[in-house]
Design a protein with these regions (language model features):
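Conserved FAD-binding catalytic core of PHBH/FMO-like flavoproteins
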Residues: 144-145, 150-250
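Conserved N-terminal glycine-rich FAD pyrophosphate-binding loop of Rossmann-like flavoproteins
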Residues: 40-60
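Beta1/beta-strand and adjacent pyrophosphate-binding region of the FAD-binding site
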Residues: 2-16
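N-terminal Rossmann-fold NAD(P) dinucleotide-binding loop
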Residues: 19-20
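Glycine-rich FAD pyrophosphate-binding loop
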Residues: 13, 25-47
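C-terminal helical "tail/cap" subdomain of flavin- and related membrane-associated enzymes
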Residues: 297-375
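FAD/FMN-dependent oxidoreductases across multiple families
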Residues: 224-307
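Conserved N-terminal helical subregion
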Residues: 5, 57-61, 72-163, 170-178
Length: 375
């Protein structure tokens, strides 16, 4: 029928990995879901994901983990180090289970999108004005008319909202460089975060049977050429990783830390649309998974159509979002503004984590996604 209206529970705008995983999770709970994306094909993102223990459990529960083509690389230990006080160092590990894994973003996205296409719930090539997408009002998708009870935006950190949204930004002049390098020594399944004089440099073991391949994220105030990035990697990792050969393809990203709110009814923000942070924490994607888990858990407890459902969701995600944004902003500030007071804060923080076991255990659990549940 030409004027038929299709009634659905959820419309998810944005078929990136977080939005797609939410769609799959809600469908498994028997909700009627459509997910729309402006692109027809997956953008082949060659980057990796740092997947903490909680996110790995989630991917396992929805039937994704064991289907990943390239076996994810294990993270057994995390080393945090800085250039102050003779390269003071923190070492974190958990003997009960891996602290995390590293997998290729694109491989997980392919699995999820294949499932969604088979379920006929995804529509590509749709580019609607986000301000005109409203719940309980007719939305036309490919000439068909739909009504959705709830709208979920998972359109990423650069989403442009205007009416009914407030966006708190945390300005930073940092830009991030992401790339890969091969090395002559075994990486020993160790992840590193080194606070260099030039900015935070993270190196993670990348999926590879020979264990001689790693990925890096370097965030800095100044532009760096490929030879300059190689020089920084060699300075900090030649001892642990041996001879380093940098891959030519380097990705460059501007950073846009923010926390966005809305009081519009039946509108949910998810993942980087809700909050985006500096990659120094390495937890942005994992927080998106927690958004999914929180929302799905709430559908078991409350009517998702009720006025208070959105308020409860935002209340549960607000504290963790603010905590991570505040922490990453503070870390960047004290390193970007070297002085006696900021050096004192850094030294004190390192010593506290070195000496107090309960604090170390809390840090480990939080990094693994097994920490305090924010309510």
């Amino acid at each position: 029928m030409k004027n038929q209206i299709h009634n659905y529970d959820f419309l998810i705008v944005g078929a990136g990995l977080v939005g797609s995983l939410l769609a799959l999770s809600l469908i498994k709970k028997k909700f009627k879901v459509k997910i729309i994306e402006k692109h027809h094909q997956i953008l082949k993102d060659q980057r990796t994901l740092a997947i903490n223990a909680n996110s790995k459990d989630f991917l396992n529960q929805i039937g994704i983990w064991n289907k990943i083509k390239t076996q994810p690389e294990v993270i057994n230990r995390i080393i945090i180090q800085d250039h102050l006080d003779n390269n003071q160092k923190l070492v974190f590990e958990n003997r009960e289970e891996p602290m995390g894994h590293v997998a290729y973003n694109y491989e997980i996205q392919e699995i999820v999108r294949s499932k969604l296409l088979k379920l006929k719930c995804m529509i590509g090539g749709i580019n609607l004005n986000q301000d005109n997408i409203k719940a309980n009002e007719i939305i036309v998708l490919n000439k068909s008319r739909y009504l959705f009870k709830k709208i979920i935006f998972a359109t990423g950190k650069n989403a442009n909202f205007s009416k009914g949204f407030s966006k708190k930004t945390f300005p930073t002049k940092h830009k991030s460089y992401v790339g890969f390098f091969s090395h002559s020594k075994n990486h020993q399944n160790i992840a590193y975060e080194i606070f260099t004089k030039n900015g935070p440099l993270a190196v993670l073991p990348a999926p590879s049977k020979k264990k001689n391949y790693s990925t890096f994220i370097f965030s800095t105030l100044e532009p760096y050429s490929i030879p300059e990035q190689l020089k920084i990697l060699e300075k900090n990792f030649q001892g642990s990783h041996g001879a380093i050969k940098l891959k030519k393809k380097i990705f460059e990203f501007s950073l846009n830390p923010h926390l966005t709110k809305t009081k519009l009814e039946n509108i949910i923000l998810l993942g980087d649309s809700l909050r985006s942070m500096h990659p120094v924490a390495g937890q942005g994607w994992n927080l998106g998974i927690k958004d999914i888990q929180t929302l799905c858990d709430l559908t078991d407890l409350y009517d998702f159509r009720s006025n208070y459902f959105d308020e409860i969701y935002y209340a549960k995600r607000q504290l963790e979002s603010v905590a991570y944004l505040g922490m990453t902003s503070m870390i960047n500030y004290v390193y970007d503004h070297p002085n006696f007071f900021n050096h004192f804060i850094i030294r004190t923080s390192f010593k506290a984590l070195q000496k107090f076991k309960p604090l170390r255990n809390l840090f480990i659990k939080q990094a693994m996604g097994r920490g305090y549940t924010f309510v």
